A protein has these predicted regions:
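Residue-level signature of mid-helix packing/kink "hotspots" within the transmembrane helices
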Residues: 32, 61-69, 150, 184-185, ...
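Extracytoplasmic gate region of multi-pass secondary transporters
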Residues: 34-36, 265-324, 384-388, 392, ...
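Primarily marks hydrophobic transmembrane alpha-helices of the MFS/SLC 12-helix fold
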Residues: 84, 138, 346-349
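Cytoplasmic helix-loop-helix junction between adjacent transmembrane helices
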Residues: 141-182
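Helix-loop-helix hairpin linking two adjacent transmembrane segments in secondary transporters
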Residues: 180-229
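Multi-pass alpha-helical transporter architecture, strongest
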Residues: 214-222, 226, 357-365, 452-483
């Protein structure tokens, strides 16, 4: 029951949007702790190589993809409030558990001190045992993290559909989706400092603990718009302005589960269009997220150095500033040109798909200055974030509210498969290329730089290919109509 009685429209929907932004920021900071500590801290202790790290990130992506199949259904069944709390508590717990991997490894291998651990001869049986055990322990923690984190975007997209009319959803999604960039932006300024001064273990514990605070705030602040004491009638009317909104709300209230079964979702071309958009492009962002610190370290600027932190910070600053405009362009097409939301989003996504093409020039120009690949990857990442925000919003354009989280989970699963392939493939490729040295070449690059060149080329063209396939599957606006 709404308790706000003023005639002036409240703007509580933006408070909720801010909470989604904070959750996504925490989500990505938890995910970034490993990428910012493995090369300079953890690998030194546990004798990891690129392939070991690639395995950990790939398995995380695989489980993230698999659990995403059920995360959307879980959010639909549990409800947004409880479901979101469960998700963030689980992933925060998983983040904190990473801190114990070193202690368990030392205990099992009967190693008495950090100095003894680091002084183990590289390539020895003891080093292999330490590396293998620690990788398995980190994998277990990453799986717990993946289980919780897989619920973030299905829940956030469902909340956006509940609190925003269709014309504003891309903007709201752009704002909370920018939390990914802000989380990645804040991470290099905080995590290496924590790891340097307090140990890499405390960086996992401190960053992971923030999620528990968010869960307490969500418990107090969130309720459905029609039940929220902070939303007045004017704002509720604005939220429900779309045709058929009221009827959909009533049907959703009556329903105990999505009106589309899991298998029925795959019968629609709209589902496959969303799947293709995620399958082609999600792994690109995850590659930038997981490998950018290691890439700059290869250029001679580790994340523990001031220059390394500056490069990563500026990269994600570019992403953050530019990606926030991802929701404005389709809104302009809808309001100024009179296009339907889907057509406006697809036109905007085509424009955003050209930004990642810059990635092809990151490696060839890296010898001039590290700032060149920094700026290029930032532009490509901004294009991804703008693309992703609009891609998520196409679900609300096409599907009934009750199925939004399920469709989001399906798409996220396929996006996770792309991330698995890119991260595992990258780790194997970089280790292989590094071993061959000058004997491995691609487009004028040799050794490990040639490996990076190969991955950057895929990152560059993935969006245009994905857009063409999506357009072929759903050429015109066609929402799902259930009989």
């Amino acid at each position: 029951m709404n308790s706000v009685t003023t005639n002036k429209m409240t703007n509580y929907r933006w408070v909720i949007c801010a909470m989604l932004f904070l959750a996504t920021t925490v989500n990505y900071m938890d995910r970034q702790v490993l990428s910012l500590t493995w090369k300079d801290f953890i690998a030194v202790d546990f004798h990891w190589n690129d392939n070991d790290y690639g395995t950990i990130t790939a398995i995380f992506s695989l489980f993230y993809a698999f659990i995403s199949l059920f995360a959307g259904r879980f959010i639909d069944w549990m409800g947004t409030k409880k479901g979101y709390i469960w998700a963030i508590v689980v992933w925060s717990l998983g983040a904190c558990l990473h801190a114990g991997c070193g202690w368990v490894t030392m205990y099992v291998e009967n190693i008495g001190s950090i100095e003894e651990l680091r002084n183990i001869a590289a390539g020895s049986q003891a080093a292999i045992a330490v590396s293998t055990l620690s990788v398995w322990l980190f994998l277990a923690c990453r799986i717990v993290l993946a289980v919780g984190e897989s619920g973030n975007f299905p829940a956030a997209i469902k909340v956006t559909a509940e609190y925003f009319p269709k014309k504003d959803r891309a903007l709201a999604t752009s704002i909370f989706n920018a939390g990914a960039s802000v989380g990645a932006l804040a991470a290099p300024l905080t995590i290496p400092v924590l790891a340097e001064h307090m140990g890499w273990e405390m960086s996992f514990i401190i960053i992971g603990g923030i999620g528990f605070i968010w869960a307490g705030l969500w418990l107090f602040l969130y309720d459905k718009p029609s039940n929220s004491k902070f939303v007045n009638e004017a704002e509720l009317a604005y939220i429900s302005q779309d045709e058929g909104e009221a009827a959909a709300e009533k049907e959703e209230t009556k329903a105990n589960e999505p009106t589309l079964s899991f298998l029925q979702c795959f019968a629609y071309r709209q589902t496959w269009a969303f799947i293709v958009g995620k399958l082609m492009t999600d792994g690109v962002w995850w590659f930038y997220l997981f490998w950018a610190p290691a890439y700059f370290s290869e250029l001679g600027y580790p994340s523990s150095s001031g220059m390394g932190q500056a490069l990563i910070f500026v990269l994600y600053l570019i992403v953050t500033i530019l990606s926030i405009y991802g929701g404005y362009l389709p809104k302009l097409f809808v309001e100024k040109l009179g296009q339907n939301p889907y057509a406006g989003r697809m036109r905007a996504m085509l424009i955003f798909a050209f930004f990642p093409l810059f990635a092809m020039f990151a490696q060839p120009l890296a010898h001039i200055s590290p700032w060149i690949p920094c700026i290029i990857i930032g532009l490509a990442g901004a294009g991804h974030q703008a693309w992703s925000a609009n891609l998520y919003s196409t679900i609300g354009d096409m599907f009934p509210k009750s199925a939004i989280a399920t469709i989001t989970g399906i798409g996220t699963m396929f996006g996770g498969l792309c991330s698995f392939a890119i991260n595992k493939g990258s780790g194997m490729l970089f280790t292989y290329a590094d071993g061959l040295g000058d004997a491995f070449s691609f487009f004028g690059q040799t050794g490990k730089p040639a490996g990076y060149m190969i991955v950057f080329c895929y990152c560059a063209v993935a969006y245009l290919i994905g857009w063409v396939i999506m357009k072929a599957l759903v050429p015109k606006y066609k929402p799902i109509v259930l009989e």
